[in-house]
Amino acid sequence: LAAIEFSSVSYRMPNGVMALDDINLRIEEGELVAIVGGNGAGKTTLLKHLNGLLKPSNGEVRIFGKNTRDSSVAQLSRKVGLVFQNSDHQLFSESVKTEIAFGLRNFGFSEAEIESRIEDVVNYYGLADMLNRAPMTLSGGEKKRLCIATVMAWEPSILALDEPTVGQDYMNKIKLRDVVKSLLSKGRTVLIVSHDLEFLWPFKPRTVVMGMGKILADAPAERIYLDSELLDRAGLRQPQLAMLAKALGRDRPFSDADEATDWIIGEHASYEFRGLK
């Protein structure tokens, strides 16, 4: 049973624009999938179909086999946690503690369980000393962690992150990678919508490329990242490690700068050795 399944899904916006056009996509439980593409590609519109914020004009979206047309947003949100690009649009409570507690109360958790879950997530996401602070006073990175903590407090099976690296510095991106790794180790299904291919590359995820509401490609990251023509068509910048690998004639991108350095030094040494023979 797939965690997520889009079957011939199209969505026409109120202004008549076709935001999704014949989307067919199956994502298994425990899988990490990157959804990439330029502005207006349909990435966020696709995410909003996961918890019923939008319903397809045509076709079906199923979450663990259940048609989203047959469930409310509240019912779907219990299984699908969405973290949107702009944290300010997701935060509204007077304190970090009440922000996290809000969703848990809506889902009917006992007060004792709410207290326990709040303690767990604030410790894990580095928010323990901010419980009484107003969310709007937090930094960009702290707000993003709070949004993720708020969603993960009720332990949805699926987490979808919309442009999670926007406005984040290098260290916060590293922390975010650790969060994603932890979720995957627990068997969660994770979708990351992003144009930041450098951030995504260490995961080497299955990558779905979107453009003009359509799926342009669905393949392993190694193949997508070397296809400069596809990336150009999707309005994406080819990662530097992929550009270097392609220039050197490799059939896959380097995993990191250390691998690139070792490979180049090794090739150079090999040329010198052959020259001396």
Spans of features found by a protein language model:
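Helix-to-loop junction immediately C-terminal to a conserved catalytic motif
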Residues: 51
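H-loop/switch region of ABC-family ATPase nucleotide-binding domains
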Residues: 194-195
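Catalytic Walker B motif of ABC-type/P-loop ATPase nucleotide-binding domains
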Residues: 159-162
